[in-house]
Amino acid sequence: MALKDLPADAQPREKLLARGPATLADAELLAILLRTGIMGKGVLQMAQELLDPPGVDAATGQPTGGFGGIAGLLHASAADLERIKGLGPAKRAELVAVLELARRALAQQLRECAVFDTPDAVKHYLQLQLAAKGHEVFAVLFLDNQNRLLAMEELFRGTLTQTSVYPREVVLHALHHRAAAVVLAHNHPSGSVQPSRADEALTQTLKSTLALVDVRVLDHVIVAPGQALSMAEMGLL
């Protein structure tokens, strides 16, 4: 059913203004952002498609379907959104902007009160920071002696190897922040979080180098859309 065919008090925008945002379903809130549908597909249907469970095309191996709810959508990139029919460049840009604001708000809250004392806390924070990036990034969380966040820096971009990530630079940044410990992190835009041999070798190199200045490596987290892996939990540290 098109929005115009709904009773006035049931249309998402009017419902939000009259009753508050908490009364709206996720699809209704998205419909307000999207504003209009396309021929043969109403805006509510388009919004629901974004929230539908994801799938995989058996022939191509490419992702299909939606993003599995708001949490999954939070990590979607502009390129990911292209698979939803009817989402043109303008709608994709608006949606990505809103999602980025949401990620920044969540990350700020975590940063202001964060004590990274469990792998889950670290993974959650890093997913907000790295999962939606379309290129590979190597980042470091610099922590004090109580595992509180001092800073996060993206130090290198591109395919990560022992030759593209410079241990000296990581050490200099750790000393600059007076860090007692670090968490290493990088993303795999391809979607796999399994560590490669290069990931393991790089981790050991950085761990040995940072130990020379009494900085502990607590973990190396690999992030992909919708998932994250802790190398510490896997016993690879």
From Swiss-Prot:
One of its GO terms (molecular function) is metallopeptidase activity. Residues 115-237 form the MPN domain. The keyword Flavoprotein does not apply. The keyword Cell inner membrane does not apply. CDD domains: MPN_DUF2466. Transmembrane segments: none annotated. GO terms for biological process: proteolysis. It comes from the Bacteria. Zn(2+) binds at H186, H188, D199. It holds the Pfam family UPF0758_N. Gene3D superfamilies: Cytidine Deaminase, domain 2. Belongs to the UPF0758 family. NCBIfam families: PRK00024.1, radc. This is UPF0758 protein Veis_1654.
